[in-house]
Regions:
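Conserved N-terminal entry element of GNAT/NAT acetyltransferase domains
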Residues: 1-38
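Conserved acyl-donor/pantetheine-binding loop and adjacent beta-alpha core of acyl/acetyltransferases
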Residues: 38, 50-57, 63-100
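Short coil/turn motifs at secondary-structure junctions
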Residues: 77-79, 106, 140, 177
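C-terminal "cap" of GNAT-fold acetyltransferases
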Residues: 146, 164-205, 210-212
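Short Pro/Gly-enriched beta-strand edge/turn motifs at strand-loop
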Residues: 40-46
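Conserved acetyl-CoA-binding loop-helix of GNAT-fold acetyltransferases
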Residues: 103, 109-125
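Conserved acetyl-CoA-binding loop of GNAT-fold acetyltransferases
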Residues: 149-163
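Conserved GNAT acetyl-CoA-binding A-motif
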Residues: 117, 124-144
Length: 212
């Protein structure tokens, strides 16, 4: 079973599972959401287009056997007015916000969420100028709520940055992701037999031996 992540684009936006292609609870404030009711999919596409054009990568999609089964959405806080509803807002100025994510139920508990977060971190490291990722997590997640569970965020490397009884603000330093990448590269090299196979020349002590 092949699985891989790719960047969120207008071409794969409509393929997102769970109706996420028409959810704008993070992208618009409550007043604007009421004004565009019935046209959420168009607004979501417009939002993705704007962020891609003005800032860069804003999401990752995970595919299993070429079928999209999950995604994460992220952007600087200025593009996510929906964060203003949280008591722990706003996000730090040096951070990008991981707004939400979704994995189809039949594919959960298989590490796809972690794969998505790692793909996001890779995009942000390449983008540059971002020190961390922050997210508003739910301590007691409710069905249909587009807020990532705190337990998931803790499991993929986030720490509590600003406590709250219901929706704390979590943070992951991108240096953590860089360290993870370095560890993976070492592991891969070991598997390929690169590490440990380079032998230093054995010095010939006879050539440098001095008479007693």
């Amino acid at each position: 079973m092949g699985r891989q992540t790719t960047r969120l684009t207008l071409d794969n936006l409509e393929q997102l599972p769970g109706g996420c292609d028409a959810c704008v609870c993070w992208e618009l404030d409550p007043v604007r959401r009421a004004q565009v009711r019935g046209h959420e999919a168009e607004e979501k596409a417009g939002w993705v287009s704007t962020v891609l054009r003005q800032w860069g990568s804003c999401g990752r999609v995970v595919c299993v056997d070429d079928e999209p089964v999950g995604h994460v959405l992220f952007a600087p806080g200025v593009f996510l007015p929906g964060t203003e509803r949280f008591a722990t807002a706003p996000a730090s100025q040096d951070a990008v916000v991981l707004a939400t994510g979704y994995v189809a139920p039949e594919h959960r508990l298989g590490g796809l969420g972690r794969l998505l977060v790692q793909g996001m971190a890779k995009d942000l490291i390449r983008h540059g100028g971002v020190n961390a990722v922050e997210a508003f997590g739910a301590i007691h997640p409710r069905p249909g709520e587009c807020i990532l569970p705190v337990d998931f965020l803790l499991a993929v490397g986030f720490k509590t940055h600003r406590p709250h009884p219901s929706y704390p603000r979590m943070r992951m330093d991108l240096r953590t992701a860089i360290t993870w990448r370095e560890e993976v590269e070492v592991a891969v090299n070991k598997l390929l037999g690169v590490v440990g196979k380079r032998r230093e020349p054995v010095p010939d002590h006879r050539a440098t031996r001095r008479p007693l």
